[in-house]
């Protein structure tokens, strides 16, 4: 998603948005400033502005949803990359005998997919019922809690790999399931367990701080506002 032109290069689950410029579509009609930013980058912006990445030079907002969104803060600013594709963590690949999206982090780290697995085990009629899933998880249900631990471990491995490349100060967890405090707690627990099992890694690489987004699932909305303010008057917003 090009934040300069407002063009969506790939609409994902909404393919009718491929190649659409929101600025070209809406500005002639409404004649007001328009900004476009994806969810992961928006979450990072809001947390940098007023949240749990405020004052951080190098950090990451990791958004758990249908896939995994990411917003990188490098040198105190949102890093988007040459093609505005930095932080597209769903497309990180895992070793596999076959080339398949099933073996990419966007599938194995999907919060939606994880909730469905839990509800399948519980026999819940609505497989997308997050409340039912987390009621069982918070009660440490012996059948579904291992599924939750495995999911948190999957995210923790991703964090280990990201940290080996970027040496971040802090990572904040967002997305709908971040409203459940146990999510960030278990990811942190699994991350530390991985490091404990690999002493040479723990001795070499500094442990990154893992926290929840201050604004949880609303971080995306606030970050979109911040992007708009930056577009209108960056100097005023940054320098107050």
Language-model-derived ranges and their functions:
Residues 44:
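Acidic/histidine-rich catalytic cores of soluble enzymes
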Residues 3, 39-40, 48, 89:
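Generic detector of well-ordered alpha-helical packing
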Residues 34-38:
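General beta-strand structural signal in soluble alpha/beta enzymes
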Residues 54-108:
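Glycine-rich phosphate-binding loop of actin/hexokinase-like ATP-binding domains
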Residues 39, 65, 224:
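Active-site glycine-centered loops adjacent to acidic/histidine catalytic or metal-binding residues
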Residues 8-15:
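Short glycine-enriched, charge-decorated loop/helix-capping segments at active-site entrances
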């Amino acid at each position: 998603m090009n934040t300069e032109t407002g063009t969506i290069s790939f609409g994902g689950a909404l393919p009718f948005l491929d190649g659409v410029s929101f600025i070209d579509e809406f500005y002639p009609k409404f004649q007001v400033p328009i900004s476009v930013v994806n969810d992961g980058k928006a979450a990072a912006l809001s947390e940098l502005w007023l949240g749990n990445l405020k004052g951080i030079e190098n950090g990451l907002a990791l958004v758990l949803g249908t896939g995994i969104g990411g917003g990188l803060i490098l040198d105190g600013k949102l890093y988007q990359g040459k093609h505005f594709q930095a932080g597209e963590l769903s497309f990180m690949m895992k070793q596999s005998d076959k080339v398949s999206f099933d073996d990419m982090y966007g599938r194995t780290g999907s919060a939606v997919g994880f909730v469905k697995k839990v509800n399948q085990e519980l026999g819940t009629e609505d497989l997308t019922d997050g409340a039912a899933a987390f009621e069982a998880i918070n009660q440490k249900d012996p059948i579904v809690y291992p599924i939750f631990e495995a999911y948190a471990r999957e995210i923790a491995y991703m964090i280990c790999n990201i940290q080996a490349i970027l040496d971040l100060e802090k990572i904040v967890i967002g997305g709908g399931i971040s409203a459940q405090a146990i999510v960030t707690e278990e990811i942190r627990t699994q991350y530390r367990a991985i490091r404990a099992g690999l002493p040479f890694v723990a001795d070499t690489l500094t442990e990154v701080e893992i926290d929840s987004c201050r604004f949880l699932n609303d971080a995306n909305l606030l970050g979109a506002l911040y992007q708009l303010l930056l577009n209108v008057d960056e100097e005023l917003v940054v320098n107050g």
